[in-house]
Regions:
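Conserved P-loop NTPase motor core
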Residues: 1-566, 587, 593, 598, ...
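Extended, charged helical/alpha-beta scaffold domains that provide interaction surfaces
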Residues: 315, 324-327, 545, 549-790
Length: 790
């Protein structure tokens, strides 16, 4: 957005102050420059704000960049750094030095001893940047680390919690977004303080490629799974049935809405196939659910577009950049249905023990900022969802790249043939070409076509991502041709030689219609730092992006043109403002739909985020207490009350059943005076104390008893939380039907989620009694406590 006059004035004012300090910094000795860190920390300790010390801090690290790296940040980079400290997003074009710019806000926020995190998409970039910039921070007396073992670390042992605490305890930490998400989850599942990773609250995060993290990945939760459920045999039955269906007769597919359903004929066919009377009878709902999963897998999960099969496993692809999403699965059974479709081993469907999305994770920081080359396109969503303004930073040199109008074709074959003609021409001129395919499958097809034409080339897709940096580095060589999926849109810069500059620079050729932000990312690979270059996209009405969002009118137009072509009319390229406007409208409609989906998901995630924060606070209180006796007494009293609430009248049979299910498996003789609820409560409390006292005789120290208490309470909490997360995930799947029924889905969801959380607290207390009473405890040879929960 356009900053108001005051904000623009603030940025210019701070830049002038930084520049005025430059001569003073240049005259300092190394020792004097290094002493600035202690001086700045004293000023912060005395009460100065970060903005007040920013000019001196930025001038200090700017000079340190020059002395250590030989690189002196430009004024535009200082402007970007000022924006990043304000908690905004700095849009800086490819090649404008975001890596160097980040040294300034990271140094400034690292002065507080509270941690400054630089979050990148992958370990290669995090390690590269930390290795390059660590000497600057260390020169100035700050500690720096990566939140993972570097590639140079050859140790085979697993990472310990102590190592992770040391990593996250540094002043400045370079990390990956996914690694950080999983560390957060595992840290909050730890059984004691020693198992937790984060020594201090989250303070400042600077997110590289912020649009990819906070938008593209916003709806994909990171999940730690619990024990698997029993594997259903219905996946194979449903898959075999779906394969037998006849299009249009048995099912209808609406790709625009990502909807597929059985027709009346299809329902009757299912009832005949499975020999049942009514497919919609409640007793067959699991069968119907598996049929729906198989339908969705067959028609909306496309191999080498949405996923790949490698080493007998289905691995998802990130549709925005074509990278493998290892460790992430599609939820609600789609993963298992797809595995069945591909004939690989079906993984067990697991309950979710813990989950978090990026919006929830980064919402925990005191301040979050971002940088990207293409955030401006989605600035309204950043403002509405994250309250983060997007500020476009001027380039150091004017951008002279030519972005040529897209060429529009009727069919995919016509499009590819023309695109390849252009590649051959550019290759013969000696210009390097980055040829972008929309999927892994298409990149392999294009590679075959290039081989048939005798054009040597590299292929960069999910199958060889390990060579990404080397391939991208060579992509600017004279005459080089690189076929790549969207993953080539971010990361390592493509540098060109003087000879290539004279020939026109790098040419980016896209072979599919893409979302506007992805298109800008790919086009931005050419023309860095004032270099010449061109970009042009070849699109057809058969591109996935187009077919999934076509209106009925657009489909009629397409079919009409195809009929004419088959009748002999020479229709190859489509011209005119009308078709361009239609495609522009289609692209906007898709973008609006995706934004709406993210907004809706974030609305439900907000409820989970609040419950997660409350739950982890309760859990950490249990971990942090050195003496849990009072807490255990309180939980036992509450748990007994919740058990007694289940019945209004308690006779001896019901009491014995309660005791044998939750207190002891041994036979008990009940007192004769258990005539009312109060007497039953007193009896159960006394029984609990007797059992705990008996267990305590096995132990040697009070610390062991406290450890036993902690294990019992945490296990009760974690089991209850797993059920809660699983319930909320299921609850989301019902939202659509509530909306169709005219109910406020958000209100109903929040109401049911709240009620479920209250039940969680009750269940945790009752499960704690089960754990305390029915567990078996012993000491091993090292006198360490061993607890077996029955």
């Amino acid at each position: 957005m356009m900053l108001d006059l005051g904000e623009r004035h603030t940025i210019r004012r701070l830049l002038k102050k930084v520049n005025r300090l430059a001569p003073e910094m240049r005259q300092m000795s190394n020792s004097q420059l290094q002493q600035q860190t202690a001086l700045l920390r004293e000023q912060i300790k005395a009460g100065k704000t970060l903005e007040q010390v920013l000019p001196r801090a930025y001038a200090t690290v700017r000079e340190a960049d020059y002395r250590v790296l030989g690189l002196y940040p430009y004024d535009v980079q200082v402007m970007g750094a000022i924006v990043m400290n304000q908690g905004y997003i700095a849009e800086m074009k490819t090649g404008e030095g975001k890596t160097l710019t980040a040294t300034m806000p990271l140094y400034l926020n690292g002065l507080m001893h509270r941690g400054a995190f630089l979050v990148t998409p992958n370990e290669y970039l995090a390690e590269r940047d930390e290795t390059q910039l660590a000497p600057v921070y260390e020169f100035l007396g700050l500690t720096v680390s990566t939140a993972f073992r570097k590639s140079t670390d050859k140790r085979k042992t697993s990472v310990t919690p102590k190592e992770k605490r040391e990593w996250y305890g540094a002043d400045i930490v370079y990390m990956t977004s996914s690694g950080f998400a999983f560390d957060y989850l595992f840290s909050n599942l730890a059984g004691d303080k020693e198992g937790q990773f984060f020594p201090k609250p989250f303070n400042y995060a600077l997110v590289d490629e912020v649009d990819m993290v906070l938008l593209d990945s916003a709806t994909s939760p990171f999940v730690v799974a619990s024990a698997p459920r029993v594997l259903s045999t219905m996946y194979k039955l449903a898959d075999d049935f779906v394969v037998s269906l006849v299009p249009k007769l048995d099912y209808v597919v609406k790709r625009r809405d990502k909807a597929v359903w059985l027709t009346y004929h299809g329902v009757r066919k299912a009832e005949s196939y499975f020999r049942i009377e009514d497919l919609f009878d409640l007793k067959y709902r699991e069968l119907y659910r598996h049929i729906c999963l198989a339908l969705r897998s067959h028609f909306f999960m496309k191999r080498d577009h949405d996923y790949v099969v490698r080493d007998g496993k289905v691995i998802l692809l990130d549709e925005t950049n074509g990278r493998l999403m290892k460790g992430i699965q599609v939820s609600s059974g789609i993963q298992q249905a797809t595995e069945q479709k591909e004939g690989v081993d079906v993984t067990p469907l697991r309950k979710t023990a813990a989950s978090v999305t990026f919006p929830s994770l980064f919402g925990m920081f005191n301040k979050i900022a971002g940088m990207s080359g293409t955030a401006k396109v989605d600035e309204n969503e950043f403002i509405n969802t994250y309250n983060m303004k997007v500020v476009t930073i001027p380039t150091n040199k004017p951008v002279i790249r030519q972005d040529l109008p897209a060429k529009i074709y009727l069919t995919t074959s016509d499009k590819l043939l023309d695109a390849l003609k252009e590649v051959v021409k550019l290759h013969q001129m000696g210009r390097p070409v980055l040829l972008v395919a929309g999927s892994v499958e298409n990149s392999e097809i294009i590679s075959e076509l290039l081989l048939n034409r005798g054009i040597p080339h590299n292929v960069l897709n999910a199958f060889n991502a390990s060579r990404e940096a080397a391939m991208v580095k060579d992509a600017g060589q004279e005459g080089a041709v690189t076929v790549a999926t969207n993953m080539a849109g971010r990361g390592t810069d493509i540098k060109i030689s003087e000879a290539v500059r004279k020939k026109g620079g790098l040419a980016v050729i896209g072979t599919e219609m893409l979302a506007e932000r992805v298109r800008l990312q790919l086009a931005g690979r050419a023309g860095r730092q004032g270099d010449p270059g061109t970009s042009q996209f070849y699109v057809s009405l058969e591109d996935d992006f187009v077919t999934k969002a076509m209106t009925t009118r657009f489909q009629k137009y397409y079919r009409h043109k195809v009929a004419k072509k088959r009748a002999g009319k020479d229709i190859v390229q489509l011209h005119g403002p009308r078709i361009r406007f239609s495609l522009w409208m289609l692209k906007n409609r898709v973008a609006s739909s995706e934004e709406s989906q993210r907004t809706q998901t974030n609305k439900y995630e907000t409820t989970l985020r609040l419950q997660r924060a409350t739950f982890y606070d309760d859990r950490n209180r249990v971990i942090g207490q050195d003496d849990l006796q009072k807490t255990v007494d309180r939980w036992v009293n509450q748990g007994i009350e919740f058990f007694l609430d289940k019945h209004e009248h308690w006779d001896s049979v019901a009491i014995k059943r309660l005791v044998n299910h939750h207190f002891t498996y041994e036979a008990v003789d009940l007192p004769d005076n258990l005539s009312d609820r109060e007497q039953v409560r007193v009896y159960l409390k006394r029984l609990c104390q007797q059992i705990i006292d008996q267990k305590a005789t096995t132990l040697i120290t009070k610390e062991q008893l406290n450890t036993f208490y902690r294990k019992c309470l945490l296990t009760a909490l974690d089991t209850s939380w797993t059920d809660q997360v699983d319930y909320l995930n299921t609850l989301r799947s019902y939202v659509g039907s509530w909306s169709l029924a005219g109910r406020d889905s958000g209100y109903v969801y929040n109401e049911r989620a709240y009620n479920a959380y209250q039940k969680l607290l009750k269940k945790a207390k009752m499960r704690a009694i089960d754990n305390l009473m029915l567990s078996i405890i012993s000491l091993n040879k090292k006198n360490q406590l061993v607890v077996q929960f029955m």
